[in-house]
Regions:
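Conserved "HGTGT" condensation-loop signature of ketosynthase/thiolase-family condensing enzymes
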Residues: 1-110
């Protein structure tokens, strides 16, 4: 493939997962390989008044493993999942230890 002069390369170097099948890349991949479903009865709220009684809920997630309590209280649950997955991807990429990192050249995509 020939790249044009104004095109930039994108490199995926780290992964993070918070999902109904696992809260880490290793756990999610293992469950996917073993055919484990993340779908089950709704437990996060009273589903008696909605048509569907099943969903893919994230289990055993603790935002306090990622941010302090005060910060977590200002985040919606879906934002907590995104922040946690992003932080895991950053760590997986080895960027924690990269002191010479040009932050203008790095991003986390969700």
């Amino acid at each position: 493939m020939v790249m044009k002069e104004n095109e930039m390369k994108v490199v995926v170097t780290g992964l993070g997962v918070i999902s109904p099948v696992g809260n880490s890349v290793a756990e999610a991949w293992e469950n996917i390989r073993n055919g484990v479903s993340g779908i089950g009865p709704i437990t996060k709220f009273d589903a008696s008044r909605v048509d569907s009684k099943v969903a893919g809920e994230v289990k055993n997630f603790d935002i306090k493993n990622y941010v302090d309590f005060k910060t977590s209280k200002r985040m919606a649950l879906f934002t907590q999942y995104a922040v946690a997955a992003s932080m895991d991807a950053w760590k997986d990429a080895g960027l924690d230890a990269c002191e010479s990192l040009n932050k203008d050249r790095v991003s986390v995509m969700l």
